[in-house]
């Protein structure tokens, strides 16, 4: 039986709210906190966690998302692939910030987060590797406007109030959309809000638009879609949800990391080959209707292991793919927002992207 530790519920959050709580005004403090976590973790060697009967405890940090990891959790694929010598614990978080903090402290081994928090983790030298892309974001994350806002295009945002969780993939996409439309930061009032606050502010009429993801996106009533992350991806600004693993853990247990990616590849295969079962699985796990689950799942691009190691994404061990440049560009964005003070050399990101576990899983 997989043990589940839902820390998002302990924080009083509603199920399914994937909250990116990285505040712009405290982003430098966050960077310092992460650095301190690394320093404290390095003060002593951490003994490997085991159960009373000697099984290796593997802690997978996750968020409530309608993706391949959601299927793998529900179908018990992680335990199946990792075997009887491993005890899998699922730890649920509500933001990439919280996932990074847990990774820095060594309290989880794997972590699901957006490409922005992943870039931040690499730039802050948290000792992680990017091993998988859960999904390339499309309609599942979008800029939407209220029906009474008068906003039909990105240009119409001028003089309006737009809410978005800062330092998130949505924030990155919003600012790129504004830049392409010729709008500066002073043209638009951009407000840092968590998804639950966006929902409340939308209903109270306090904001004109929001850039947000599912499931909050579907909960906003009387809305018009202005632009989607899928459209921005086609313009060269790809955002995604990715998986990172602690480098020290991966070096000690490469077989477990291979088993992890096998579980995800199995989930993607289910979605591509048996869509109805995949939709039903996500609907039950996230307490959604099947129609809603189908809508949310179709709003992003799921990649098989073979697709992951193409030049468009992770690439191969001998020739890293476009994700390296994407992470580097994201770090440049994070620097402009004050989330980091320095962008490391691109070689740092190239080293952190590690497709070898997928290659091994595929017998390459």
Language model features by range: what are they?
Residues 90-101, 114, 183, 188-204:
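Short helix-initiation/N-cap motifs at beta->coil->alpha
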Residues 325-364:
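Conserved C-terminal helix/tail region of periplasmic/extracytoplasmic solute-binding proteins
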């Amino acid at each position: 039986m997989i043990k589940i530790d839902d820390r998002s519920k302990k924080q009083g959050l509603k199920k399914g709210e994937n909250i990116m709580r990285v505040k712009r005004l405290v982003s430098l403090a966050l960077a310092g906190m992460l650095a301190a976590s690394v320093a404290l973790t390095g003060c002593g060697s951490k003994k490997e966690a085991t159960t009373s009967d000697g099984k290796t405890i593997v802690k997978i940090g996750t968020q409530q998302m309608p993706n391949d990891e959601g299927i793998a959790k529900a179908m018990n694929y992680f335990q199946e692939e990792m075997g009887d010598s491993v005890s899998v614990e699922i730890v649920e978080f509500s933001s990439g910030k919280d996932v990074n903090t847990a990774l820095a402290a060594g309290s989880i081994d794997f972590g699901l987060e957006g490409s922005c928090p992943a870039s931040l983790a690499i730039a802050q030298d948290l000792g992680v590797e990017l091993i998988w892309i859960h999904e390339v974001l499309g309609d599942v994350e979008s800029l939407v406007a209220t029906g009474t806002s008068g906003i039909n295009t990105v240009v119409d945002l001028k003089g309006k109030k737009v809410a978005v969780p800062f330092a998130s993939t949505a924030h990155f996409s919003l600012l790129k959309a504004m830049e392409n439309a010729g709008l500066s930061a002073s043209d638009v009032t951009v407000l840092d809000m968590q998804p639950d606050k966006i929902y409340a502010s939308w209903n109270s009429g306090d904001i004109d638009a929001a850039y947000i993801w599912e499931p909050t996106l579907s909960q906003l009533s009387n809305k018009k879609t202005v632009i989607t992350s899928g459209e921005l991806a086609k313009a060269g600004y790809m955002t995604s949800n990715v998986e990172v693993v602690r480098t020290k853990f991966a070096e000690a247990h490469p077989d477990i990391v291979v088993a992890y990616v096998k579980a995800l590849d199995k989930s993607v295969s289910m979605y591509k080959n048996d869509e109805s079962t995949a939709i039903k699985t996500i609907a039950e796990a996230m307490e959604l209707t099947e129609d809603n689950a189908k809508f949310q799942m179709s709003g992003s691009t799921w990649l098989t292991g073979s697709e992951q190691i193409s030049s468009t994404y992770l690439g191969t061990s001998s020739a890293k793919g476009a994700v390296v440049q994407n992470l580097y560009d994201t770090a440049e964005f994070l620097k402009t927002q004050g989330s980091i003070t320095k962008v490391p050399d691109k070689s740092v990101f190239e080293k952190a992207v590690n497709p070898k576990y997928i290659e091994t899983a595929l017998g390459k």
